[in-house]
């Protein structure tokens, strides 16, 4: 091999190694995690578990809107960090399709058995309760979504728990 060809191959190899290193460095971004009912999801600050979903025929004096069904599931959140944090029921988005309007939040708690609006959790403490949401009658899956927000305001990892209806 000539000196010129050797230098070219050496330069090409260096460029390829640099490109591979840059590609691998870009792979450290946010990730998505999917789970199913009764599986514990581990975020940076807490663990959460969503129980099996069930469809309710009614609840107290609530009237179920035409074309919808009332879905309930039990949720537990445990602070696994070393600091106290507030947990909000609205931190968890409910999704039931791919459309722009196929999402919502759980209902305002109507009883003490329901997940509270907000709770301050010390390290190791847990909060639990039932979440209820109206979804279209034809929805077959309810997905509970949580998006981490980093200290700099950027989105971190996201987590999805798929519940069969």
Question: What does each model-identified segment do?
Answer:
Residues 2, 6-30:
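Sec-dependent N-terminal signal peptides of Gram-positive bacterial secreted proteins and lipoproteins
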Residues 26-165:
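Conserved functional micro-motifs across diverse proteins
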């Amino acid at each position: 091999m000539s000196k010129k060809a050797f230098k070219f191959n050496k330069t090409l190899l260096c460029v390829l190694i640099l490109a591979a290193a840059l590609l691998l460095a870009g792979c450290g971004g946010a990730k998505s995690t999917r789970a199913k009912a009764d599986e514990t999801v581990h975020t940076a600050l807490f663990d959460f578990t969503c129980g099996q979903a069930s469809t309710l025929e009614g609840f107290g004096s609530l009237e179920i809107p035409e074309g919808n069904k009332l879905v309930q599931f039990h949720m537990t959140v445990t602070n696994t960090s070393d600091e106290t944090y507030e947990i909000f029921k609205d931190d968890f988005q409910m999704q039931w399709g791919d459309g722009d309007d196929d999402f919502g939040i759980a209902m305002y708690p109507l009883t003490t058995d329901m997940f509270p609006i907000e709770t301050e959790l010390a390290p190791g403490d847990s909060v639990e309760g039932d979440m209820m949401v109206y979804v279209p009658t034809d929805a077959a899956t309810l997905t509970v979504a949580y998006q981490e927000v980093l200290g700099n305001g950027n989105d971190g990892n996201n987590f999805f728990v798929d519940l069969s209806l």
